[in-house]
Amino acid sequence: MDINASRALANVYDLPDDFFPKIDDLVRDAKDALEPYWKSDSIKKHVLIATHFVDLIEDFWQTTQGMHEIAESLRAVIPPTTAPVPTGYLIQHEEAEEIPLGDLFKHQEERIVSFQPDYPITARIHAHLKAYAKINEESLDRARRLLWWHYNCLLWGEANVTNYISRLRTWLSTPEKYRGRDAPTIEAITRPIQVAQGGRKTSSGTRKPRGLEPRRRKVKTTVVYGRRRSKSRDRRAPSPQRAGSPLPRSSSSHHRSPSPRK
């Protein structure tokens, strides 16, 4: 990956959350884009990475949705006087990356006890589920952005997606009164430029060479007695006879020559 594409990929994390499709729509669009490559058993980089994130997102998404459903169902059995665990006592995504997966439950339980030692068991389970679901959602968000990048590189080409991210970032960072009303779209960037017809006349046939050519003098000719005669050389008055008709004989030619037989 060249430096421009690497920079554009890093900028994907800074794009607004609502720029990306919802998880269900994203996975469906990605599968549609990947299907031709799956049929041909392609091993392109973008195909392999996008396939990995499709599987990862589907598994994480289902697990996260299940956590939310169980947590909501536990609300009915939590004592109404129980205060929710403050956000500061819940493990955040950045902290979870530094903690081994097997120790995640232990660290979260210690924080809940430090908040309230006799915290009800149902409320503890609810707090655990909410913390893990939040961690999963942030991981899903990162995976969602990466999946969007890789399957769009398959659809539009890595260079076009890189150019699009650069233009979109420029548009977002420009004050509203100095930028266009609508954000740039990748469809508009990749659309071929059409030249208006009729603006210039096109000549068919052989192409004339460039540069100046010496002008050739045109010599007008006429035909007299089947021969070509240059008008530039003969400036005499025109004959009343038509071209190609016999000229009248002179008076001396009217006398018939004696026959050689006499």
Curated annotation (Swiss-Prot):
Pfam families, sorted: Hepatitis_core (PF00906)
Region named Disordered: 183-262
Region (RNA binding): 254-260
Motif (Bipartite nuclear localization signal): 215-233
Keyword set, alphabetical order: Capsid protein, Cytoplasmic inwards viral transport, DNA-binding, Host cytoplasm, Host-virus interaction, Microtubular inwards viral transport, Phosphoprotein, RNA-binding, T=4 icosahedral capsid protein, Viral penetration into host nucleus, Virion, Virus entry into host cell
Basic residues bias (residue ranges): 215-234, 252-262
GO CC, alphabetical: host cell; host cell cytoplasm; T=4 icosahedral viral capsid
InterPro entries: Hepatitis_core (IPR002006), Viral_capsid_core_dom_sf_HBV (IPR036459)
Residues bearing the modification Phosphoserine: S232, S239, S245
Family named by the database record: Belongs to the avihepadnavirus core antigen family.
Subunit structure, interactors included: Homodimerizes, then multimerizes.
Record's function text: Self assembles to form an icosahedral capsid. Most capsid appear to be large particles with an icosahedral symmetry of T=4 and consist of 240 copies of capsid protein, though a fraction forms smaller T=3 particles consisting of 180 capsid proteins. Entering capsid are transported along microtubules to the nucleus. Phosphorylation of the capsid is thought to induce exposure of nuclear localization signal in the C-terminal portion of the capsid protein that allows binding to the nuclear pore complex via the importin (karyopherin-) alpha and beta.
Protein name (database record): Capsid protein
Native organism: Duck hepatitis B virus (isolate brown Shanghai duck S5) (DHBV)
Encoding gene, per UniProt annotation: C
